[in-house]
Amino acid sequence: MGQNGRLSAWYFWYFAFIGAFLPYFALYLQSIGLSAGRIAVLMSLGQFMRLLAPLLWSWLADSGGRRVRIVVASTAAALASFSVVFLTEDFVGLLIGMAILHFFWSASLPLVEALTLGHLAAHPERYGRIRLWGSVGFIVTVMGVGFLLDSAPIRSQLWVSWFLLLGTLLSALTLSEVKQTAGQMAGPILDVLRQRKVVFLLAAGLFMTAAHGALYVFYSIHLVAQGYGKSLVGVLWTLGVVAEIVVFLLMPRISLRISLRQILLACFALATLRFMLIGWAVESIGLLVFAQLLHGASFGAHHAATMAALNRWFVAGQQARAQALYGSVAYGAGGLCGALLAGALWESAGAAITFSAASALALAGLILVWRGVPGDSQGAPVR
């Protein structure tokens, strides 16, 4: 198997774990009697660790030039720390175990992303063909675990997740390093970070990820509480990822006709609609399906457009740090704030208000894009 195949396999296992863990772990926590607030805290630990951990791991990798070794070691540590879920149901014990898990788990993706782009150096347009297998892995497990949990105890989700983590570790062992050139490792980025468009793009990304906080923490709980089966919950999660894949495939064509600014504005507008539908139209399966298809815009198109903007605004030697910074600001700070806000609102105000708040966050991001992201990207393809 060539490096393309090994990278594709790694993405498959990595996102397969996320597909088994993210949508259903909150249901397990609910089953052991934890409050919505404590569930939100545990589910937001991933975002909390992404505040600073990616910057630390990327610095270590760049200074030592041993990305694969760090990926392997951190995945092994994540596997060991995840095992705490089999040993305790105590909140403090789970808090410590999940904190350690996410500290090490946060190392892998940015380093493998850099590894992939370095491997594809002359053909970055092929990135989607490799990254696509991550979405496939997510679909397989989110549907499979959903059907499994209709007949098996919720605790079985933990074992599935553990074995998928093991698969990720074994896959990481097959990866090989890509040599970096001096030009790829050089270059201060403060001058770029001070630019208005960069500040507004990062801030908008924070609000978009914060808006998704309610979705990632409480979407499954929300649907199960309305009487939907866990297999249907899995299908709805899968629809979102299918929409994401379709958008990834279509983005090069779309961006030849629509500017990056227009794409981002559409993403935030559709995200605003999506979260209102989830909160207020949960009894309509048709509207829920439509809302999940909008994941193609609220995540897929937004992610692709943001990556394209960073690729255009930062030179090659700044890309790794730019990606790590965006991950810390958007997925770290934004994800953490969104999850904690959702946890605070869920029990006190209810599901509809919680998802309305998510919609308001997306609307705030729309305003930031409108005010701060220039419309100068027409004709430059988003890869």
Report the location of each language-model feature.
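Helix-loop boundary and gating motifs at the non-cytosolic
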Residues: 1-50, 198-205, 209-236
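Cytoplasmic helix-loop-helix junction between adjacent transmembrane helices
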Residues: 98-133
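Structural signature of the two symmetry-related core transmembrane helices
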Residues: 69-83, 162, 262-277
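Interfacial helix-cap and linker-helix signal at transmembrane-aqueous boundaries
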Residues: 29-30, 60-61, 132, 147-152, ...
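Symmetry-related core transmembrane helices of the 12-TM Major Facilitator Superfamily/SLC fold
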Residues: 156-173, 353-371
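Juxtamembrane intracellular "pre-TM" segments in multi-pass secondary transporters
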Residues: 1, 174-207
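Helix-to-loop junctions at the C-terminal end of transmembrane segments
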Residues: 52-66, 149-150, 246-260, 346
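Hydrophobic core of transmembrane alpha-helices in multi-pass small-molecule transporters
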Residues: 12, 81, 91-109, 206, ...
